[in-house]
């Protein structure tokens, strides 16, 4: 099994080529923030180009799959200038597109609540 190190997600691939992509902010119910969005995009790009990966399972650590957007992240974006709001929105769109366009089957293993962006994934 191989794994890659991130702060807000974990990525592990077993010997069968099954990659487990786990949202790892359980104290925040895996709510999306800028860092989680960036790391999901990076992981999607890595998994897409890894020929040893045959399928990706997306799940969340803890009681919730994903509570949607982190309110502190929303609050910070609301107070930011227009260019920052556009940049943050674009990062979210690119991450969702990277997951949607993954050239391997993507299976959602949803445990517990999924709201907002968590439903979108």
Map each language-model feature to its residues.
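Generic recognition of short, well-ordered alpha-helical segments
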Residues: 34-35, 69, 120
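Residues that form or flank phosphate/diphosphate-binding pockets in enzymes
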Residues: 31, 66, 117
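Glycine-rich beta-to-alpha active-site loop
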Residues: 95-121
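Conserved CoA-thioester-binding segment of acyl-CoA-metabolizing enzymes
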Residues: 1-61, 97
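Histidine-centered beta-alpha loop that forms part of the nucleotide-sugar donor binding/catalytic region
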Residues: 24, 69, 111
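Glycine- (often His-adjacent) and acidic-residue-rich active-site loop
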Residues: 60-98, 114
């Amino acid at each position: 099994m191989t794994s890659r190190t991130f702060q807000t997600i974990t990525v592990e691939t077993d010997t069968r080529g099954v990659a487990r992509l786990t949202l790892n902010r359980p104290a925040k119910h895996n709510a999306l923030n800028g860092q989680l969005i960036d790391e999901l995009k990076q992981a999607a790009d890595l998994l897409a180009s890894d020929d040893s990966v045959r399928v990706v399972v997306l799940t969340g650590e803890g009681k919730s799959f994903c509570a949607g957007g982190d309110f502190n992240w929303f609050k910070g974006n609301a107070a930011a200038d227009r260019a920052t709001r556009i940049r943050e929105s674009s990062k979210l769109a690119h991450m969702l597109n990277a997951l949607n366009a993954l050239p391997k089957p993507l299976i959602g293993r949803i445990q517990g609540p999924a709201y907002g962006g968590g439903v979108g994934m």
